[in-house]
Design a protein with these regions (language model features):
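N-terminal strand-loop-strand
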Residues: 2-50
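Short, flexible active-site-adjacent loop segments at beta-strand->alpha-helix junctions, enriched
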Residues: 28, 37, 87-89, 113
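Generic "edge-of-domain/loop-turn" microfeature
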Residues: 29-30, 41, 114-116, 139-142, ...
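A generic membrane alpha-helix/interface feature
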Residues: 39, 91-95, 154-156
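A short acidic, glycine-rich active-site loop
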Residues: 53
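Unchanged
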Residues: 56-80, 89-147
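Charged phosphate-binding loop/patch that engages nucleotide di/tri-phosphates or the phosphate backbone
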Residues: 142-166
């Protein structure tokens, strides 16, 4: 018996969570990632590296959310960001245990070698983000650690071939 209709029905009932993710690149062409370590939520025991970013607020565009997240997570003010360079759609579990369909847009933002300013972090971010790190392209290409999105090197090669080469 084929139960594919059950999967389709379940996906049709799932909330779509729109979010903007930022590939933040410094003057040395390193990419900033945060390490998320979950201890007291539905993702307890999971640890991974991920980009700056987060969900859209009511009425926001992906671009507006990208600028807001850049300010909230790094203290960097931008009035706009360039067009997104990648789109991702996938199922994911949130720390609340809700399973959603994630609809992400990835943007590239260049900043000076500024330190991460955590003054605007939410309480949740303070709990789950254990550290930040600037990664070289080669480090990202060769790491065995869990990194989301897992295709950052390919996105960089496709978007900025004059800087990032395989």
């Amino acid at each position: 018996m084929n139960n594919s209709h059950l999967v389709t029905s379940r996906k049709n009932q799932m909330r779509i969570r729109k979010s903007s993710r930022l590939l933040v690149i410094n003057e040395n062409h390193q990419i900033l990632l945060f390490q998320f370590t979950h201890t007291n939520d539905a993702l307890a025991g999971q640890s991974y590296w991920a980009t700056v970013g987060g969900g859209l607020e009511e009425g926001e565009t992906f671009e507006q959310a990208a600028c807001r997240e850049l300010y909230e997570e790094l203290g960097v003010v931008r009035q706009n960001v360039d067009t997104h360079v990648a789109t991702r759609n996938f199922e994911m579990m949130l720390p609340s245990a809700e399973v959603v369909i994630s609809d992400e847009r990835l943007f590239i933002v260049f900043i000076k070698n500024e330190e991460v300013n955590t003054a605007n972090w939410s309480e949740h971010e303070k709990l789950v983000i254990s550290k930040s790190r600037w990664w070289t392209f080669d480090e990202l290409s060769q790491t065995n650690e869990i990194v989301y999105p897992n295709n950052i090197p390919n996105i960089l090669i496709d978007s900025l071939p004059e800087i990032f080469k395989p």
